[in-house]
């Protein structure tokens, strides 16, 4: 088993980027397994071993690699054409320093120029420690989808001082945002999307989905309300406080029952009803008074009629004045009943003196 110390000896004294990554033995082991499983490696005769094994032999793993660094781009997959390590000034040590300590991002390419150019004499790129075997398998599956994608380039040999077309002169640059890790076909512009992913629907698709959602929401609204009503759990009522489980819960005290209040009437209607009641009372009193008046009139008329009849009878009667009291003594009881005492002075004054007739 190769340890980070032994591997650093064999690589010829490469300087690690960060001492914290020396403990990641498992990740370096994965990178070695990936390298051994790749039979397409070829070495260039003129390049020193340190340059050829620059991407593999570094035992360090940066804790947080910038999104645009070639290490992250190498770990993205075998077919990833996004980043290339820049060629050095001419010495192997300079190339090692550029590859290990100063990772640089690649410049923005025009849509006409491919992302990177393949080189038949170069070896297949290695998987970095940060991605591992899972990232390599994912990259291989994506590479099968796009067979025409160019391979990642390694640093050129020290004898070639000229950079490749599309590359930038070495120098520290700020890291760019994370780029797409899926392969691109050569000649495909930067703005195009991958073939493995479906193209975005755009406004038309989103609008259509929103329209479908709006149409479906109106139809599902009553159904959702019904479901909510049906889903409400039936909570059983507990034992009454009094302990009477047979107690009828519908029965309540009269004070607890809700009583309907009488309908409120307007002020005008109240005054109208009061006036009507007053008129009814007045009319009833008037009727009683009228009835009493008629009764009194009838009584008075009756009395007057009786008095007038008596007077008429007296006027029409024939009387005999008894001037001899001895006759009264000899008269019988039956005769005495018909005899009356009356005041005859008024009659004598009104009428001329007549000869009185004796009653038999």
UniProtKB/Swiss-Prot annotation:
<keyword id="KW-0164">Citrullination</keyword>
<comment type="function">
    <text>Required for proper chromosome segregation during mitosis and error-free mitotic progression.</text>
</comment>
<feature type="compositionally biased region" description="Polar residues">
    <location>
        <begin position="66"/>
        <end position="83"/>
    </location>
</feature>
<feature type="modified residue" description="Phosphoserine">
    <location>
        <position position="47"/>
    </location>
</feature>
<feature type="modified residue" description="Phosphoserine">
    <location>
        <position position="58"/>
    </location>
</feature>
<feature type="modified residue" description="Phosphoserine">
    <location>
        <position position="69"/>
    </location>
</feature>
<protein>
    <recommendedName>
        <fullName>Coiled-coil domain-containing protein 86</fullName>
    </recommendedName>
</protein>
<feature type="modified residue" description="Phosphoserine">
    <location>
        <position position="66"/>
    </location>
</feature>
<feature type="modified residue" description="Phosphoserine">
    <location>
        <position position="128"/>
    </location>
</feature>
<feature type="compositionally biased region" description="Pro residues">
    <location>
        <begin position="153"/>
        <end position="164"/>
    </location>
</feature>
<dbReference type="InterPro" id="IPR026570">
    <property type="entry name" value="CCDC86"/>
</dbReference>
<feature type="coiled-coil region">
    <location>
        <begin position="272"/>
        <end position="323"/>
    </location>
</feature>
<feature type="modified residue" description="Phosphoserine">
    <location>
        <position position="217"/>
    </location>
</feature>
<keyword id="KW-0539">Nucleus</keyword>
<feature type="compositionally biased region" description="Basic residues">
    <location>
        <begin position="238"/>
        <end position="254"/>
    </location>
</feature>
<keyword id="KW-0158">Chromosome</keyword>
<feature type="modified residue" description="Phosphoserine">
    <location>
        <position position="188"/>
    </location>
</feature>
<feature type="region of interest" description="Disordered">
    <location>
        <begin position="328"/>
        <end position="360"/>
    </location>
</feature>
<feature type="modified residue" description="Phosphoserine">
    <location>
        <position position="110"/>
    </location>
</feature>
<feature type="modified residue" description="Phosphoserine">
    <location>
        <position position="21"/>
    </location>
</feature>
<feature type="modified residue" description="Phosphoserine">
    <location>
        <position position="24"/>
    </location>
</feature>
<dbReference type="GO" id="GO:0005730">
    <property type="term" value="C:nucleolus"/>
</dbReference>
<feature type="compositionally biased region" description="Basic and acidic residues">
    <location>
        <begin position="273"/>
        <end position="295"/>
    </location>
</feature>
<feature type="modified residue" description="Phosphoserine">
    <location>
        <position position="50"/>
    </location>
</feature>
<dbReference type="Pfam" id="PF03879">
    <property type="entry name" value="Cgr1"/>
</dbReference>
<feature type="modified residue" description="Phosphoserine">
    <location>
        <position position="102"/>
    </location>
</feature>
<feature type="compositionally biased region" description="Basic residues">
    <location>
        <begin position="1"/>
        <end position="12"/>
    </location>
</feature>
<keyword id="KW-0597">Phosphoprotein</keyword>
<feature type="modified residue" description="Phosphoserine">
    <location>
        <position position="80"/>
    </location>
</feature>
<feature type="modified residue" description="Phosphoserine">
    <location>
        <position position="218"/>
    </location>
</feature>
<keyword id="KW-0175">Coiled coil</keyword>
<feature type="compositionally biased region" description="Basic and acidic residues">
    <location>
        <begin position="302"/>
        <end position="314"/>
    </location>
</feature>
<feature type="modified residue" description="Phosphoserine">
    <location>
        <position position="91"/>
    </location>
</feature>
<dbReference type="InterPro" id="IPR005579">
    <property type="entry name" value="Cgr1-like"/>
</dbReference>
<feature type="modified residue" description="Phosphoserine">
    <location>
        <position position="113"/>
    </location>
</feature>
<feature type="modified residue" description="Citrulline">
    <location>
        <position position="342"/>
    </location>
</feature>
<feature type="modified residue" description="Phosphothreonine">
    <location>
        <position position="65"/>
    </location>
</feature>
<feature type="region of interest" description="Disordered">
    <location>
        <begin position="1"/>
        <end position="314"/>
    </location>
</feature>
């Amino acid at each position: 088993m190769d340890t980070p110390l032994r591997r650093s000896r064999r690589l010829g004294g490469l300087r690690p980027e960060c001492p914290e990554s020396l403990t990641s033995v498992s990740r370096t082991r994965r990178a070695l397994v990936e390298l051994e499983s790749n039979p397409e490696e070829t070495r260039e005769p003129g390049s020193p071993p340190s340059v050829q094994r620059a991407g593999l032999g570094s035992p360090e793993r940066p804790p947080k690699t910038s999104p645009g660094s070639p290490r992250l781009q190498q770990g993205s997959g075998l077919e990833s054409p996004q980043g290339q390590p820049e060629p050095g000034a001419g010495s192997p040590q300079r190339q090692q320093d550029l590859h290990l300590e100063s990772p640089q991002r690649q410049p923005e390419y025009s849509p006409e120029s491919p992302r990177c150019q393949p080189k038949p004499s170069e070896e297949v790129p290695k998987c970095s420690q940060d991605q591992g075997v899972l990232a390599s398998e994912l990259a291989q599956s994506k590479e099968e989808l796009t067979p025409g994608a160019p391979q990642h380039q390694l640093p050129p040999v020290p004898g070639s001082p000229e950079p490749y077309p599309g590359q930038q002169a070495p120098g520290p640059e700020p890291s760019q945002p994370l780029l797409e890790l899926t392969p691109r076909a050569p000649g495909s512009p930067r703005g195009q999307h991958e073939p493995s992913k479906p193209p975005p629907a755009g406004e038309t698709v989103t609008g259509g989905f929103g329209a479908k959602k709006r149409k479906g929401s109106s139809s599902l609204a009553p159904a959702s309300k019904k479901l909510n009503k049906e889903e409400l759990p039936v909570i059983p009522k507990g034992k009454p406080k009094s302990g009477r489980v047979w107690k009828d819960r519908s029965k309540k005290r009269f004070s607890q029952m809700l009583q309907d209040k009488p309908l409120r009437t307007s002020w005008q209607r109240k005054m109208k009803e009061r006036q009507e009641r007053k008129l009814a009372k007045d009319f009833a009193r008037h009727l009683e008074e009228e009835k009493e008046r008629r009764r009194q009139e009838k009584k008075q008329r009756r009395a007057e009629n009786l008095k007038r009849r008596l007077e008429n009878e007296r006027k029409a009667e024939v009387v005999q004045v008894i001037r001899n009291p001895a006759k009264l003594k000899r008269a019988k009881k039956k005769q005495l009943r018909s005899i009356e005492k009356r005041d005859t002075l008024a009659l004598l004054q009104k009428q001329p003196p007549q000869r009185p007739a004796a009653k038999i």
